[in-house]
């Protein structure tokens, strides 16, 4: 018979890194008595959430999808970014059967190949090198008409940094002698993930019907006109370039984002016959629509890189051992604490319950830096008091989502709100004898301005993230921990042996070590 759940709570403070620099550091500037007290009195240290330590290229900043995959898997997960880059380097990409089938069908009928994707070197949702490779693939397979519909970043990159990326793609098309950038739009519209269909509709109508609010002779001119309207990359309004292009019946469309969460909505508009979230002017009958990776199992389109399966991730292993678990987050990070933390699995494991708290409906989260954290905390405190679960896994979105706004004062408020929430959870746990681990998936809010450009720093960082144990046991934190070590640490606290698939090792060790 299992004992009464104590619970063990894993708090993931999204985008909450540690920087030795105090410049533009919202974590340093915030009044955070609870976290300060825990760091002074509890076993704690820093762990890595970027680069090779999470299965990304060396020096690449971490992100929420990658972070949660590693946290939940208990092993370093080879990321889609790295898989695609390697396939391009090895030449396998240019023979990819799924992409080639769609491109060849369009080419044989004398039709166009449309490339969609985030044009950026941010490496979080996409990489411009992948877009270049796709243009080269289309050219090599005989496409006469190659159109890039570029989504601009300014979020995982500096707010006004798209010019160099546009120049690079213009140069690529010039070298190939075929193809061009057909449209520009900010990711705010094309890559929504919060069912703001009015935004997605603007991107869809731009791509499919060549309907933009603005037109420019070249992509460079289109970008400069947007800057003159005081739009940073993320918010560039729908702009057609040159003679407006439409997606015609028989064309092929390849979506080159490798990260799923912000590619799903636009993809659904293209491929779902019964799509009803807004009135489509038309749905082209395509030679093929290819997702670079599987954006969701329910989307009726093939993917170029099929998902790898992860066995015995934390959620699965807890279920097999008869443990109950709660996953809870607000809308912005719900997919991360469920789908990504479960290794790319949509449905809950046996004994797993989920609570989704709606994110506030504001244009940008600097307008409401507390987001829905207080409501999330209410639910967790209630669950702890009633001892309903063995394990509670929560994501707090504030550090990341407010960090992305680039507004320092709001970021400080976000950190201060988090401190209050952590305090409430720790107090509730003390009353029932529970334990907690506090960590993050990657950095962001600890660097709010870019010293080299003087612009707001809206992107993630490569900084390490905190790791704090909250409980009564005499344990110490070892050096060199990574996100993949968090699940094995939780199993140690729960008294469960680690499955063979988990190659991570506990960050908490006995003081004798």
Curated annotation (Swiss-Prot):
One of its GO terms (cellular component) is cytosol. Keywords: Glycolysis, Isomerase, Manganese, Metal-binding. Its EC number is 5.4.2.12. It catalyses: (2R)-2-phosphoglycerate = (2R)-3-phosphoglycerate. NCBIfam families: pgm_bpd_ind. Catalyzes the interconversion of 2-phosphoglycerate and 3-phosphoglycerate. PANTHER family: 2,3-BISPHOSPHOGLYCERATE-INDEPENDENT PHOSPHOGLYCERATE MUTASE. Monomer. This is 2,3-bisphosphoglycerate-independent phosphoglycerate mutase. It comes from Pseudomonas fluorescens (strain ATCC BAA-477 / NRRL B-23932 / Pf-5). The gene is gpmI.
């Amino acid at each position: 018979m299992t004992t009464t759940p104590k619970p063990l709570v894993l708090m993931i403070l999204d985008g909450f890194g540690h920087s030795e620099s105090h410049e533009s550091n919202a974590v340093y500037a915030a009044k955070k008595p609870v976290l300060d007290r825990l760091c002074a009195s509890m076993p704690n240290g820093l762990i890595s959430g970027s680069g090779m330590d999470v299965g990304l290229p060396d020096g690449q900043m971490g992100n929420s999808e990658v972070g949660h995959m590693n946290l939940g898997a208990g092993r370093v997960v080879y990321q889609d970014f790295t898989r695609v880059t390697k396939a391009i380097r090895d030449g396998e990409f240019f023979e990819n059967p799924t992409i080639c089938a769609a491109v060849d069908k369009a080419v044989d009928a004398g039709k166009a190949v449309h490339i969609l994707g985030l044009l950026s070197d941010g490496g979080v949702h996409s990489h411009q090198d992948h877009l270049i490779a796709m243009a080269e693939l289309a050219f090599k397979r005989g496409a006469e008409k190659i159109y890039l519909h570029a989504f601009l970043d300014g979020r995982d990159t500096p707010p006004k940094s798209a010019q160099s990326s546009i120049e690079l793609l213009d140069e690529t098309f010039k070298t190939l002698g075929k193809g061009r950038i057909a449209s520009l739009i900010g990711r705010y519209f094309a890559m929504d993930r919060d069912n703001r269909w009015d935004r997605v509709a603007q991107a869809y109508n731009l791509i499919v019907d060549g309907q933009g609010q603005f037109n420019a002779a070249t992509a460079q001119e289109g970008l400069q006109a947007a800057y003159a309207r005081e739009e940073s990359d993320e918010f560039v309004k729908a702009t057609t370039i040159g003679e407006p292009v439409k997606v015609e019946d028989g064309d092929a469309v390849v979506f080159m984002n490798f990260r799923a969460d912000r590619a799903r909505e636009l993809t659904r508009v293209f491929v779902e016959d019964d799509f009803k979230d807004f009135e489509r002017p038309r749905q082209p009958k395509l030679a093929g629509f290819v997702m670079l990776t599987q954006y969701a199992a329910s989307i009726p389109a093939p993917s170029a890189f099929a998902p790898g399966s992860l066995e015995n991730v934390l959620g699965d292993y807890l279920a097999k051992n008869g443990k109950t678990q709660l996953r809870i987050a607000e809308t912005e990070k719900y997919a991360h604490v469920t789908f990504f933390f479960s290794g790319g699995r949509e449905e809950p494991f046996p004994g797993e319950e989920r609570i989704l708290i709606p994110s506030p409906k504001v244009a940008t989260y600097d307008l409401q830096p507390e987001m829905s954290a207080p409501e999330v905390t209410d639910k967790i405190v209630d669950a702890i008091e009633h001892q309903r679960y063995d394990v509670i896994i929560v994501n707090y979105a504030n550090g990341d989502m407010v960090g992305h706004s680039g507004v320092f004062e709001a970021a400080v408020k976000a950190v201060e709100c988090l401190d209050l929430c952590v305090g409430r959870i720790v107090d509730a746990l003390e009353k029932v004898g529970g334990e907690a681990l506090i960590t993050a998936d990657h950095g962001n809010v600890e660097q709010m301005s870019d010293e080299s450009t003087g612009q707001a720093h809206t992107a993630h960082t490569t900084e390490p993230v905190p790791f704090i144990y909250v409980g009564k046991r005499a344990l110490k934190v070892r050096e060199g921990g990574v996100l993949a070590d968090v699940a094995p640490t939780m199993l140690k606290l729960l008294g469960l042996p680690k499955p063979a698939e988990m190659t991570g090792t506990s960050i908490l060790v006995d003081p004798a070590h």
